[in-house]
C-alpha cells in the first residue's frame, strides 16, 4: 500500500479542513467524493489494478483512522479497530464490503458502548457503509469455533487503530492449536466450495456469471489461500509458490487471472454504482468497451470479451482443481497404500491414477491421450493425482502436428469414443487440462466462445460436451422414460461412436464467420481422414454435421400434416440409418442448447416427423402418399367413429361439404370426429364454440389443443391471440380454416408459461374457455395489444426484425417467415397488421428460441389467393418491422419471391 499519495488523500489538507469546520462530516464527505473520482479516473486511464484496489484500501484506512481519532480513547485503552475479510487483505473495489471488527480485551462492552456508537454513527453520516462487529478476544474464540465464516474472516485481519497486541492475542486463541485444525478446515471449505459451485450450476459458463462466486471466480482463488493459510501460514500466491506448492508458471497464471477478474469487478461496481458481482447483460457490452475490446468481422466485442472471461475462469478452475487435489493428498491422505500398477506408464494410488515416473509424457507422449482412455476403461478411478495433472500441463506443449498425426494417438482418441462409459467425463477432463483443444485445434477455437443471445445458454465448447453427455444419458434406464424413442434408437445404432464424433464436430465451425455447419463439415472430413476412419463412417459424420439443424427446422417450421413435406424430408435423409442418427443428434442438441427449449410439444413434433418419415421410407420413396387418398382415409375413419356414437351420416356429410380439403389434411380422424360431434350439437345461436383437450400421442402429445368454431370475422385471429396472451398461454401451432359457409375452424396448440400442457385442471380449462368466448363475443371491446413491460434480459438482445415473403410452390398460399426479438403480445401485434392489410391467415408455426422468435405464417389475400403485388409485400414488411422493432430502425431485411 502507498505511504503517501496526496492526489488521493492529502492528510495535511484534510486536517486543515477539519479544523475549519464545526462538524467533521462535510470534510469527510468531500474527501470520499474526491477519492472516488480520482480512483475511477485512474481505472479508466489503465492504472495497474492491484495498485488500484490497494490504493482504495489505503484511502479507507486513512479515513477510518481520522474518524477514530475524532473520539477520545485513552492511551492504554484495550480497544482496537481491525479490518477483516477482503478489506483485511487490503483489497477494496468501489463498493466492496468494508468489514470492521472492533476488538476489546474485556467481555464487558459497556465502558466503550457510547464512543463506539458515536464512531459508527459518524461512519454512517459520512456515507461509509461498513459491516461491523464488536467482540472481545474471548468472544472471537467462541464465535470462530462455531462459525466457518467468522474464523475465515478473522484469519484475514489488520490493525487500523489501537494496540496491535489485541489482534495478536485474537490470532493466537483462534489458531489451529485451539480450533479448526487444517484437516477439519479443509473439509469444511471444500464442502462450502462444492455447495457454492452447485448454486451456479457447477459451470464456469453461465450467461450472466458471478465474478466472485461462480466456479473459477475470485472466491476459488480465495479458497486456495484460506486453506493454505490454515495449513502453512501462507499469506498470498507468491508465498505459496515460494513454499513449492505452486510452480512459477502457475503462480503467474493465477495472478494474471485474478487481476483480469479484478478489472471486471471494478468496472462492474463503477458502472452499477453499487456492490454488484453479477456480470449482467446490462453491463457486458459497456465493460467490453471499458477494457478495450472492439468488434471485428468474425466476433462482436462482447463475444471477444466474454470468451476471454470464460477462458480465464476455466484456467482458474483448472488450477483450483489441481491445488485442491494437492491439498487433499497432503492434508487427508495417510499415503499408506501401495500403488497398484496399471501398465508401465501408470499406476493407481489411493484410487487416483498417476504416472509411474516424471518422464512418462516426455518419453511416451501418446500417454497424454492414453491416460483418459484408461480412466474410461477403469471407471473405478476417482481422478488424476495432482503431480500427474502438473506433468500433463508441463508436457502439453509436445502436442504438435506430428503428435496429432501419430497413428498411436489417433487410434487412442477413437478408442475413447468406443468405451461403454466415461466418454463425456473424460472429454471434460481433456478440456479442463487443456489437452482437447491442443489435440483438436479447431476445438480449441471454440473454448469459451459465447453466443450473445438467450437461446444458447452455454459457450460452444460447454454445449458440445453437454450434447455428448445427453447422448450418453440416453442409454440410462431413468432417462429412457423421458426420451423413450431416442433411447430406443440410441441402443440400436450400429456404430454409436459415430454419433459422439458428429456431436463433437456439429458446432465446431462457430465463431469464424460464415455457415458453421459447412465449416464444421470441412473439419469433420479432415478429422476422418487423419483418424483413418472408413469412408462410410466419415461420410455419415460429415453429413450429420452439415445437416444437424435440418430436422429441428423442418419439425418447427413446416406443416407436418402435408404429405409432400414428409416425402421431401424422406428423400433428404434417404434411409432409416441416416434418419436414426439425425433424430438422436437433434434431440441431444436441443437439450444441450438450453434445457427450457425441450418441452412436450417440441418432442412430439420431432417424434411425428421421425415416425412419418420412417413410414414413408418403408413404403418406398417411389410410392408417396396421395393427398386425395389421405383425405378419404381420414374421412372414413372419422365417420366410423361418429356413426358408432349415433351421429346421423347425412348431417356429417352436409357439415363436411363446406370444410375443404385442407381441414382433413391437417387433422386426424379422431380430431375430425371430436370437432364434428361438438359442432353438430352446438345451437345455431350458441355463440363461439371453444373445445379444449390434451393432445394424444398420435396427435402431438404434450400440448393442449384448443379448437374454436365460430362465424368468421375479420379480426378473429388478432382477438384470439391477444386473449390467449392475456391468459398466459404460449401458442406453438395455429391451423386456421375458413369454411365455404363462412365459419372459422381454428386449432391452436398451446402450452402454459412454464412450457407444460394445461393438464387435467377443470378450473383452468373453464377460465380459458370463458376468456376466449368473452373476447370473441365482444371483439370491439377487447384490447388487441397486451401492454406489458419487456423483460430486462430481452432488452439487451434487440435486433432488426427480418421478414421473408415467398409463395409456396406446392400450395396456393404465401409464406411469411419472421425472425424477430421476442416481446409481450407479439402475435397480437402480427394479427393487428394482418387485419390492417386485409389478409387471411391459413396456418402458422410458432417457435420461441431464447430472446428471439422464428415464426412462419401461411397467408392469403381477401380473395384467398396468394399475394402477387411486390409493393404490397414491401409495405407489409415495413409495417411488421416497425411494429416489432425494440431499439432498431426498419432496415433492408426483406426478401420477396412472388
Swiss-Prot record:
User: What region holds the ACT domain?
Assistant: 705-788, 815-891
The known regulators of its activity are described as: Uridylyltransferase (UTase) activity is inhibited by glutamine, while glutamine activates uridylyl-removing (UR) activity.
What is the official name of this protein in its record? Answer: Bifunctional uridylyltransferase/uridylyl-removing enzyme
In residue numbers, the region (Uridylyltransferase) covers 1-341
The Gene Ontology biological process terms listed for this entry are: regulation of nitrogen utilization
Its family? Belongs to the GlnD family.
Asked if Ribosomal protein is a keyword of the record, the answer is: no
Entry GO MF terms: [protein-PII] uridylyltransferase activity; phosphoric diester hydrolase activity
Origin species, per record, is Pseudomonas syringae pv. syringae (strain B728a)
UniProt lists the gene as: glnD
Cofactor requirements of the protein: Mg(2+)
Coiled-coil positions: none
Q: Which residues form the HD domain?
A: 460-582
Q: What is its EC number?
A: 2.7.7.59, 3.1.4.-
Amino acid at each position: 500500500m502507498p505511504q503517501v499519495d496526496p492526489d488521493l488523500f492529502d492528510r495535511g489538507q484534510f486536517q486543515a479542513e477539519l479544523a475549519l469546520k464545526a462538524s467533521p462530516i462535510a470534510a469527510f464527505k468531500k474527501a470520499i467524493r474526491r477519492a472516488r473520482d480520482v480512483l475511477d479516473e485512474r481505472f479508466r486511464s489503465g492504472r495497474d489494478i492491484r495498485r488500484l484496489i490497494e490504493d482504495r484500501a489505503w484511502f479507507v484506512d486513512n479515513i477510518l483512522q481520522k474518524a477514530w481519532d475524532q473520539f477520545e480513547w485513552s492511551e492504554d485503552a484495550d480497544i482496537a479497530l481491525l479490518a477483516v475479510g477482503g478489506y483485511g487483505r487490503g483489497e477494496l473495489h468501489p463498493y466492496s464490503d468494508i468489514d470492521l471488527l472492533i476488538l476489546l480485551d474485556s467481555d464487558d462492552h459497556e465502558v466503550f458502548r457510547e464512543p463506539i456508537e458515536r464512531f459508527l454513527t459518524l461512519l454512517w453520516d459520512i456515507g461509509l457503509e461498513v459491516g461491523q462487529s464488536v467482540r472481545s478476544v474471548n468472544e472471537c474464540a467462541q464465535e470462530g469455533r462455531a462459525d466457518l465464516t467468522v474464523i475465515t474472516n478473522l484469519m484475514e485481519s489488520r490493525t487500523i487503530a489501537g494496540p496491535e497486541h489485541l489482534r495478536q492475542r485474537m490470532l493466537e486463541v483462534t489458531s489451529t492449536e485451539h480450533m479448526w485444525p487444517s484437516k477439519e478446515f479443509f473439509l469444511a471449505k471444500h464442502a462450502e466450495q462444492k455447495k457454492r459451485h452447485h448454486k451456479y450450476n457447477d459451470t464456469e459458463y453461465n450467461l450472466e456469471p458471478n465474478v466472485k462466486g461462480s466456479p473459477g471466480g475470485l472466491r476459488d482463488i480465495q479458497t486456495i489461500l484460506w486453506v493454505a493459510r490454515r495449513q502453512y501460514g501462507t499469506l498470498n500466491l507468491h508465498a505459496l509458490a515460494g513454499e513449492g506448492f505452486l510452480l512459477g508458471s502457475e503462480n503467474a497464471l493465477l495472478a494474471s487471472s485474478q487481476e483480469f477478474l479484478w478489472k471486471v469487478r471494478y468496472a462492474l461496481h463503477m458502472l452499477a454504482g453499487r456492490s454488484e458481482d453479477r456480470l449482467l447483460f446490462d453491463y457486458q457490452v459497456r465493460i467490453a468497451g471499458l477494457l478495450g475490446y472492439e468488434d471485428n468481422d468474425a466476433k462482436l466485442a462482447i463475444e471477444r470479451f466474454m470468451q476471454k472471461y470464460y477462458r480465464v475462469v476455466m484456467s482458474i478452475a483448472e488450477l483450483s482443481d489441481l491445488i485442491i487435489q494437492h491439498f487433499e493428498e497432503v492434508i487427508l491422505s495417510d499415503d499408506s497404500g501401495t500403488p497398484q500398477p496399471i501398465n508401465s506408464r501408470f499406476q493407481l494410488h489411493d484410487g487416483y491414477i498417476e504416472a509411474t515416473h516424471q518422464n512418462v509424457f516426455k518419453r511416451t507422449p501418446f500417454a497424454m491421450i492414453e491416460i483418459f482412455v484408461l480412466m474410461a476403461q477403469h471407471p473405478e478411478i476417482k481422478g488424476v493425482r495432482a503431480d500427474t495433472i502438473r506433468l500433463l500441463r508441463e508436457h502439453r506443449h509436445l502436442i504438435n502436428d506430428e503428435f496429432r498425426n501419430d497413428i498411436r494417438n489417433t487410434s487412442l482418441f477413437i478408442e475413447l469414443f468406443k468405451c461403454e462409459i466415461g466418454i463425456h467425463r473424460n472429454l471434460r477432463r481433456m478440456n479442463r487440462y487443456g489437452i482437447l483443444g491442443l489435440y483438436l485445434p479447431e476445438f480449441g477455437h471454440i473454448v469459451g466462445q459465447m453466443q450473445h443471445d438467450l437461446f444458447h445458454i452455454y459457450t460452444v465448447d460447454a454445449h458440445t460436451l453437454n450434447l455428448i453427455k445427453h447422448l450418453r444419458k440416453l442409454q440410462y434406464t431413468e432417462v429412457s422414460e423421458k426420451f423413450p424413442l431416442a433411447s430406443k434408437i440410441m441402443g440400436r445404432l450400429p456404430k454409436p461412436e459415430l454419433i459422439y464424433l458428429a456431436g463433437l464436430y456439429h458446432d465446431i465451425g462457430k465463431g469464424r464467420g460464415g455457415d458453421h455447419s459447412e465449416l464444421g463439415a470441412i473439419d469433420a472430413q479432415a478429422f476422418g481422414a487423419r483418424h483413418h476412419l472408413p469412408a462410410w463412417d466419415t461420410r455419415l459424420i460429415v453429413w450429420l454435421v452439415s445437416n444437424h439443424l435440418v430436422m429441428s427446422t423442418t419439425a418447427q417450421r413446416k406443416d407436418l400434416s402435408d404429405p409432400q413435406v414428409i416425402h421431401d424430408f424422406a428423400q433428404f435423409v434417404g434411409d432409416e440409418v441416416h434418419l436414426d442418427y439425425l433424430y438422436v443428434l437433434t434431440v441431444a442438441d436441443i437439450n444441450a442448447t438450453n434445457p427450457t427449449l425441450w418441452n412436450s410439444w417440441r418432442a412430439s413434433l420431432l417424434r411425428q416427423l421421425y415416425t412419418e418419415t420412417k413410414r414413408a421410407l418403408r413404403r418406398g420413396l417411389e410410392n408417396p402418399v396421395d393427398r386425395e387418398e389421405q383425405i378419404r382415409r381420414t374421412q372414413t375413419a372419422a365417420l366410423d367413429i361418429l356413426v358408432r356414437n349415433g351421429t346421423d351420416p347425412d348431417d356429417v356429410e352436409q357439415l363436411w361439404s363446406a370444410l375443404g380439403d385442407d381441414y382433413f389434411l391437417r387433422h386426424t380422424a379422431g380430431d375430425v370426429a371430436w370437432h364434428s360431434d361438438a359442432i353438430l350439437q352446438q345451437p345455431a345461436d350458441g355463440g363461439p364454440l371453444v373445445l379444449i383437450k390434451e393432445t394424444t400421442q398420435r396427435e402431438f402429445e404434450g400440448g393442449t389443443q384448443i379448437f374454436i368454431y365460430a362465424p368468421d370475422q375479420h379480426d378473429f385471429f388478432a382477438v384470439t391471440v391477444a386473449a390467449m396472451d392475456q391468459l398466459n398461454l404460449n401458442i406453438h401451432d395455429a391451423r386456421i380454416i375458413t369454411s365455404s359457409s363462412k365459419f372459422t375452424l381454428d386449432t391452436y396448440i398451446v402450452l402454459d408459461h412454464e412450457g407444460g400442457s394445461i393438464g387435467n385442471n377443470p378450473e383452468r380449462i373453464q377460465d380459458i374457455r370463458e376468456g376466449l368466448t368473452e373476447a370473441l363475443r365482444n371483439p370491439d371491446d377487447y384490447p388487441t395489444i397486451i401492454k406489458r413491460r419487456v423483460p430486462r434480459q430481452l432488452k439487451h438482445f434487440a435486433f432488426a426484425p427480418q421478414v421473408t415473403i415467398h409463395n409456396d410452390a406446392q400450395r396456393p398460399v404465401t409464406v411469411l417467415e419472421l425472425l424477430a426479438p421476442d416481446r409481450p403480445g407479439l402475435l397480437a401485434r402480427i394479427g393487428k397488421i394482418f387485419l390492417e392489410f386485409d389478409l387471411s391467415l391459413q396456418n402458422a408455426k410458432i417457435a420461441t428460441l431464447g430472446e428471439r422468435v422464428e415464426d412462419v405464417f401461411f397467408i392469403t389475400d381477401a380473395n384467398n389467393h396468394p399475394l402477387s403485388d411486390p409493393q404490397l409485400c414491401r409495405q407489409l414488411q415495413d409495417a411488421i418491422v416497425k411494429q416489432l422493432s425494440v431499439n432498431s430502425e426498419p432496415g433492408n431485411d426483406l426478401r420477396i419471391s412472388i
